[in-house]
Amino acid sequence: MLSPMKTLQKKFNDFKKKIHSKSGIGELYERQIRYIYEKNGWWVKPYGILKGKSDLGRDLLCYKKKQVHIVQAKNWSKYKTIHEKHIMQLAGTILHYIQKNKKNPQGVFITTTKLSPTAKEFVKKLNIKHRYIKLDQNFPMIKCNINRKGKKLFFLPFDKFYDHVHIEKNKGEFYTNSLKECIKKGFRHVGKR
């Protein structure tokens, strides 16, 4: 019989090797982009994962001081092309956000594939940032979080509240792929009593 930590490590390894559905790969890509933002000091709400089909075309809402980024993330085959209708969806949700929140966010379109010439023109004219970021299924996925009571807990991508947990570097929180690192730094798995 495996120890609890070895069992968790096996579950985590199996998750990373798993062949995910289209929506599962999309969530993985959104989580990777979230990781990149949080690593750089942003507070991120995973709007797309939490809201599902009702996400208003907003995969991530990212906040840093007075800056707001509304991110649309598209993990598509490198053989596909992003057309202007997807850029317009992001532009529309930005306008809706401005109307509701009286703040002027930056639109960011992140994808694994190319934009059509017209989509490139729209991105430029609408002042939307475009980033090409390849899906990396080995990005650090374990979240080491310190809760309000000071408890050091780590969350795995299949844990119930994983997407509700924020990582703030300035509080000593971090992402990793190593359960040993979590334990060594005094964190315990959220599911363990």
For each feature predicted by the language model, list its residue ranges.
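Short, composition-biased local secondary-structure segments
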Residues: 1-10, 76-99, 136-159
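Structural element of the ATP-grasp superfamily
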Residues: 33-37, 123, 182
